[in-house]
Regions:
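Short mixed-charge
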Residues: 3-23
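ER/secretory pathway lumenal C-terminal domains and tails of membrane proteins involved
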Residues: 7-10, 37, 42-51, 56-79, ...
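Short helix- or helix-capping micro-motifs
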Residues: 24-32, 84
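Phosphate- and divalent-cation-binding pockets in alpha/beta enzyme and binding domains
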Residues: 532-536
Length: 747
């Protein structure tokens, strides 16, 4: 606003000062009260801090612009590099500011030309790629390989990485000294910026230090160089195609081997196998793939959003329709409208006109998109997240956008690029599948921040229009008063649904999950939403620290199994019998069923021993020549030690006569994953010494058809040696009425 309103080399008038201040206040308040940023600001997540870094680097580049011709202006560039490095330890979203920052530099240093802009964009994208892949992952990747070489030569873990880091430090020190001595300003700036970027990036060292202390919560266990590399590459989240890839109906026609994976056991790196990369039928691959997931619920949603009927094969037109209808409209523009037009409610939706849409508060417009709004039940009319902004923030922002382009096209392009890179570019990069586990509006807060800059400039636009009809100072004051209505409306509408005081649902569920369990129990939970509240209440409030929470999503990883085999808080180690080498990553990740015509039920302990055997006779050979373990049967039996059951109070006294001699069950899947193997190992060898529970929210697929031996004791099913009678109402297992009453009424 200063660059537009103030006249160069003139003392600003009162009206101009008021306009500039009001623009800043209105824009800042509008962003403060946007739905997405406000929610991020009041939850314990990384996105508020990430947005802080986005804001401060944008502020810093404009501070540099003001003094760009001064001798020491380069200090601002170095500060930006340091802040970028620090932000990497928070979230990678901040890196998307780089192209916008590069444009500011170009417009300040060079006369405008389309070729110049194109070159600047190309250079900025190269810088972005270098930071993303060359520094964040590449620095550690090279260090890990050097550390491997040193370790194989007899040195301890991290020796090679430390040597490598010292070489980098020495090279940078000499380079900076040389550039200073030879007066090579550009080289000096590049090296200093790189050095400070690395300095900020070293904040990740605390992750390694923390992991080496083996705390109870230690995701990915990044205590060696290869584990840290996997942590940085977010390998647990898998890959998705971006530029070229398969449709969901593409068949796998082959596979290639990726880089070798390593893990550390007893201070030595050992190979765990190369990553297998599937190759898909080229006839069913496309550029810009959007519909790639083969999960059945995703496939049905792809068809729904792209207009595919029946068994029709997806075409590129369907691919684009899904991109625009779901990924762009539903997963970006809907969120944009939440923040600047209004929000229907806080119920997550998947296209239903009753859940999670945008509304304006203007009846005839809302009726066009969502049907008559006057016939809604009170529960929907009075939803606290039903926020109506009447298009006011959107209209003021559009006025500011037009005014910005009219008065200062170069800087308007900077803001537009920031909007695109932190909005639309993220949509393309994330390539989201349908049925996301939560609303993802927080990922686009940077784009909403950019639009709020235009909301602020809307004040200047209105003041500029009004001063043609009245004195300039009066116009500025009137524009300020009019535009303050916008953030006021946003604050008023959002106040009740963004106040998280007394919101204890997640905490209370966690409390009830844990208190459904007997002392020293093990409880299996489904994923992040089920597990994190339990971890919080144990770690922060100290509630039921004797219970071991096992996240089934993480149980497919070797590092997590290692952790739950250690004591944590008051909880004893989980008594798995498998050794690390038997479940190390790349080993028994997937165990298929091969029918060997085994009659009847097989002892589960024998099956575990067979599946974990390294004897070639216990394996089958794939077409590629690899040997792997398999399940010879899907019918299992566990012998029940009735004395141990009674001694450990596994069942209520009145139910001891119902204890069976054997637990017999048959899995329905044609394979088991590593997590299933660990569950089977635990129930086979636990011998009823440790209570075992499954949270009621765990999916049937993870129950392994054990439901007939489940006993409800609250918000968890206990695994017991009592076979429940079939219940026509669909009730899972039996109910321990006395225990359940005690848990509900007294805990």
């Amino acid at each position: 606003a200063r660059k537009i309103v103030f006249v160069k080399n003139q003392e600003p008038s009162l009206a101009q000062i008021l306009t500039v201040v009001a623009s800043g206040v209105v824009g800042a308040m509008a962003f403060t009260f946007t739905d997405s940023f406000w929610f991020s600001a009041v939850e314990g997540e990384v996105y508020a801090t990430s947005q802080f870094f986005t804001c401060i680097v944008v502020w810093a580049v404009f501070k540099w612009e003001n003094v760009a011709d001064e001798k020491h202006s380069i200090r601002w560039i170095i500060l930006i590099a340091y802040l970028m490095g620090l932000s990497i330890g928070v979230h990678l979203l901040n890196l998307l500011c780089i192209p916008a920052l590069a444009l500011v530099y170009y417009f300040r240093k060079y006369p405008f030309s389309w070729m110049g802009v194109a070159k600047t964009m190309g250079i900025s994208l190269v810088i972005l790629m270098v930071v993303q892949y060359g520094i964040i992952a590449g620095f550690v990747n090279i260090g890990a390989k050097i550390d491997l070489w040193f370790n194989q030569s007899g040195s301890s873990l991290w020796t090679g990485f430390v040597v490598y880091s010292l070489i980098i430090l020495a090279a940078l020190t000499y380079g900076i000294y040389y550039s200073q001595k030879k007066q090579k300003a550009l080289l000096n700036t590049v090296l200093l910026s790189f050095a400070f970027l690395l300095l900020g990036y070293t904040s990740y060292a605390q992750i390694v230090v923390r992991s080496l202390a083996n705390p109870p919560m230690d995701e990915n266990n990044p205590e060696n160089a290869f584990a840290l590399l996997g942590y940085l590459n977010r390998e647990q989240y898998g890959d998705r195609p971006l530029g070229y890839g398969q449709y969901y109906d593409a068949k796998v026609v082959g596979q290639t081997e990726g880089a070798m994976s390593y893990t550390a056991i007893d201070g030595k790196y050992i190979p765990t196998g190369a990553k297998v990369i599937p190759e898909y039928d080229p006839a069913r691959c496309t550029v810009f793939p959007r519909m790639y997931s083969r999960e059945p619920n995703h496939v049905s949603a792809y068809k729904e959003w792209s207009g595919i009927k029946g068994e029709q094969k997806p075409e590129f037109s369907n691919n684009l329709k899904y991109f625009f209808s779901y990924q762009m409209n539903h997963m970006f523009w809907r969120y944009f409208m939440w923040n600047f037009v209004g929000r229907q409610n806080d119920i997550q939706g998947h296209g239903s006109i009753l859940k999670g849409n945008w509304i304006s508060g203007i009846p005839f417009i809302d009726s066009m998109f969502l049907g008559p709004q006057d016939k809604l039940p009170d529960s929907m009319k009075n939803n606290k997240a039903r926020n109506k902004f009447y298009f006011l923030p959107l209209l003021l922002g559009l006025a500011g956008l037009v005014y910005h382009y009219k008065k200062d096209m170069n800087n308007a392009n900077v803001v537009m690029l920031l909007f695109i890179m932190t909005g639309i570019a993220i949509v393309i990069y994330l390539n989201q599948t349908p049925y996301q586990p939560r609303e993802r509006d927080y990922a686009y807060a940077g784009a909403f921040y950019a639009f709020c800059i235009w909301i602020g400039l809307g004040v200047a636009a209105i003041a500029d229009a009004l001063k043609k009809r009245m004195p300039e100072t009066t116009a500025a004051m009137l524009a300020t008063l009019l535009c303050l209505v916008v953030p006021t409306v946003m604050a008023k509408e959002g106040w009740d649904d963004h106040n998280r005081s007394y919101r204890y649902t997640s905490r209370d569920f966690a409390y009830n999950y844990l208190n459904s369990c007997a002392p020293n129990a093990v409880i299996f939970t489904n994923g992040d939403n089920d597990t994190f509240p339990l971890w919080y209440i144990q770690d922060v409030e100290g509630v039921r620290t004797d219970v071991r929470v096992i996240n089934l999503s993480l149980l497919n990883t070797d590092w997590y199994i290692d952790q739950i085999k250690r004591k944590a808080y008051e909880s004893d180690p989980v008594p798995f019998t498998l050794k690390t080498r038997q479940y190390v990553q790349g080993t028994r990740d997937y165990i298929p069923f091969y029918d060997r015509s085994v009659q009847g039920y097989s002892d589960l302990k024998d099956i575990i021993e067979f599946v974990t055997s390294d004897n070639p006779e216990a394996k089958v050979r794939s077409e590629g020549g690899d040997e792997f373990n398999y399940l010879p049967t899907k019918k299992f039996r566990i012998k029940v030690d009735k004395e141990a059951v009674i001694k450990n109070h596994v069942v209520e006294a009145k139910d001891t006569s119902k204890i069976v001699d054997y637990i017999e069950f048959e899995i329905s899947k044609n394979y088991i994953m590593k997590a299933d193997l660990m569950i089977l190992d635990l129930i086979a060898h636990n011998d009823w010494t440790r209570p075992i529970y499954f949270a009621v929210t765990v999916g049937n697929d993870s129950y392994l058809n054990l439901e007939n031996y489940f006993q409800t004791e609250g918000l968890a099913y206990r695994f017991v040696p009592i076979k429940a009678a079939a219940d026509p109402s669909g009730q899972t297992g039996s109910v321990a009425s006395e225990r359940m009453y005690d848990n509900m009424m007294n805990k």
